[in-house]
């Protein structure tokens, strides 16, 4: 009986923590935060790639989904594994791109051109809310 309560408590704590980490963001605020990303990315439909790919339509798409962008082998490995840009994956990626790519590609030599990190949870939530509108 105690094990059942313990397991239920752990499950509830994990579910709560996951939900708290991905609270609903503000898309308008996220558009403002995305200005930090403009040196390397565009956000317009049909926009050009820069150092990084155009991010229009990235949400719920697979990793390395843009045919006109030269992704590294690490990103094509993530695509081959079926990685999709969900809220959780985007949040983990923008928080620490290098660590994310190392973990998800399975390649200990994995690299990412993206060195910029968003560290504030509210900015991450807001940028994700903005990316969700770009479809």
From Swiss-Prot:
What Gene Ontology molecular-function terms does this entry list? electron transfer activity; heme binding; metal ion binding
Signal peptide, first to last residue = 1-23
Annotated heme c binding lies at: 37, 40-41, 114
Q: How is it modified after translation?
A: Binds 1 heme c group covalently per subunit.
Keyword terms, alphabetized: Electron transport, Heme, Iron, Metal-binding, Photosynthesis, Signal, Transport
Please, which domain of life does this record's source organism belong to? Bacteria
Pfam families per the record? Answer: Cytochrom_C
Any one Gene Ontology BP term: photosynthetic electron transport chain
What residues form the membrane-spanning segments?
A: none
Tell whether Acyltransferase is among the UniProt keywords. Answer: no
Q: Which family does it belong to?
A: Belongs to the cytochrome c family.
**What function is annotated for this protein?**
Cytochrome c2 is found mainly in purple, non-sulfur, photosynthetic bacteria where it functions as the electron donor to the oxidized bacteriochlorophyll in the photophosphorylation pathway. However, it may also have a role in the respiratory chain and is found in some non-photosynthetic bacteria.
Output the PANTHER family linked to this UniProt entry: CYTOCHROME C
Its recorded name reads: Cytochrome c2
Gene source species: Rhodospirillum rubrum (strain ATCC 11170 / ATH 1.1.1 / DSM 467 / LMG 4362 / NCIMB 8255 / S1)
Q: Which gene encodes it?
A: cycA
